[in-house]
Amino acid sequence: MTPDELNIILPTLPEKPGCYQYFDEDGKVIYVGKAKNLRRRVSSYFYKEHADRKTRILVRQIRSIKYIVVDSEGDALLLENSLIKEYQPRYNVLLKDGKTYPSIVIKREPFPRIFATRDIKKDGSEYFGPYPGALIAKGMLRLVKEIYPIRTCKLDLREEKIRQGRYRVCLQYHIKKCKGPCIGNQTSNEYESNVSEIRDLLRGNLHRLVRMYRDRMQVYSEGLRFEEAQICKERIELLERYEAKHTVVPRNIDNVDVFSYDEDEHTAYINYMHIEHGGINRVYTLEYRKQIEESKEELLAAAITELRQRFESNAHEIVLPFDTGWQTGESITTTIPRRGDKRKLLELSEKNVAQYKLDKLKRAEKLNPEQRALHIVHGIQKDLHLDRPPKHIECFDNSNIQGTSPVAACVVFKMGKPSKKDYRKFHVKTVEGPNDFASMREIISRHYTRLTEENLPLPDLIVVDGGKGQLSAAYETLDKLGLIGKIPIIGLAERLEEIFFPKDPVPLILDKKSETLKVIQHLRDEAHRFGIGFHRDVRSKKQIQSELDNIKGIGKKTKEDLLRHFKSVKRIRSAEEEELSALIGRNKAKLLYEGLRKK
């Protein structure tokens, strides 16, 4: 829109609550929004600098504006939800259903069937749920079928067809799981009475059913109808056993909606739980694909409206993790609990939404391993407060025994995994005796001097195996090379798995299950393994050299032949003189045999 057009339109917008619609040059709705004050909200799009690229693109595409005034912000929220569903604007959040949770349906038909389904149809049938998983839905159905004999067939049980005698009973009738309404053995009223009780059960109202069966059992017992009293007793036991296993909500919390929120860079996740009759009888997760500068408060408020409408919730209270400003004209209490039973319910919802987000990430990572690697390095960046993701990490470890044969190792991880072709071994050349700090200075200096001189890529992070002393030695060396600020460096102290930063006496302690800590531990362990293996090889080689070199008459070629054949000095020493003679000749064999026996 041109500045002249804006100067005409914006001042005329009302300072009232309502919804606004942005149209592109084709007259298509590209964005719908709600506002407490229409003029202020719409003006902010044109008179404010936007950091978000999508917002800038949206503003450039706006060619006309329409608005609808309503009585309250709550009405604006409801209207916005309807308009987004109607027009599906390109720049609004994209609503995606969470995984399709199962519900239990009571079909609208004569002698209604009751079964689990993921397909909700608007055919007048009643739906209960959705349940958090198929096992829970099946468990509830199993309870229903243990208590009530309901039909499972798909027969058309209209009265005239039953009268015509078209049907025969099935196995369910013979095993007493169905009373045979198909042949007229059960009246519609009797069947509907059972269905009415099943509705109570599916709504979670177990206590009312238990009281009802206790009263019936008393009446049957007094009337000496012991068989019927026994059936009531068995049903009470089934209900109480189910309740003991599944009730996780205090009985004083009834008809309450609980919402929790989580998000990543591109998506918001909202979990919804409905609490009724002391039980959780509905759990659902929505995904909102973020499109344009929505706050978490706006996204959660939109989800509350959407979910309450979808499931026709009349809950008198909603429990939230933070204030959203959500309101309607209804008298609904909003609670943000800090402790107590409602806080526990909110934490349960938060666990569900976090698990949903994690499951989605795991599924995506299975399909795309590179995404998992990227997720890990971004996690390391976040946990260690780095300026860039550490896609290339180098870790150093020294190895010696009382200062003898000092060596060092450098292992390299790329995208969170070992890159063995880039591993490096070092002989420590300038250090006498056991001095790990001096050894670290030498190795860091040699390695990074070579990288800078040869213009090779530097790592995104250096990890030093050791505490503050080793870290300080490496940091001082990097400072002399002018690399401070170019390469971040940390030290890992083994005893408590503390992570130290240069010139900071307070270590960082990560969660033991943290991916970042696991990668750093893997780096440290790999450097340790590689360094010890190299040190063992060096010691072994020196030992071989010292034992065979000191025997006169045994030259380099002879040593090579012996080691190739016997593999070790120990086996050479245990060999008989005749065996040695066959390989290197009688004279050399005698010199070698006697020389090794003297040692």
UniProtKB/Swiss-Prot annotation:
Provide the GIY-YIG domain boundaries: 15-93
> What does the UniProt entry say about where the protein is found?
Cytoplasm
Chief place of localization: cytoplasm
| Domain UVR: residue ranges | 207-242
Query: What's an example GO cellular component term for this entry?
Result: cytoplasm
The protein's UniProt keywords, in alphabetical order, are: Cytoplasm, DNA damage, DNA excision, DNA repair, Excision nuclease, SOS response
Query: What SUPFAM superfamilies does this protein map onto?
Result: C-terminal UvrC-binding domain of UvrB, GIY-YIG endonuclease, RuvA domain 2-like
Annotated coiled-coil positions are none
Organism of this sequence: Porphyromonas gingivalis (strain ATCC BAA-308 / W83)
DNA damage found in the keyword field: yes
Q: Which gene encodes it?
A: uvrC
Summarizing the function annotation, the protein's role is: The UvrABC repair system catalyzes the recognition and processing of DNA lesions. UvrC both incises the 5' and 3' sides of the lesion. The N-terminal half is responsible for the 3' incision and the C-terminal half is responsible for the 5' incision.
Record text on subunit structure and interactions: Interacts with UvrB in an incision complex.
What highest taxon heads this organism's lineage?
Answer: Bacteria
Query: What Gene Ontology molecular function terms does this protein carry?
Result: DNA binding; excinuclease ABC activity
What are the recorded Gene Ontology BP terms?
A: nucleotide-excision repair; SOS response
Q: What is this protein called?
A: UvrABC system protein C
The family line of this record is: Belongs to the UvrC family.
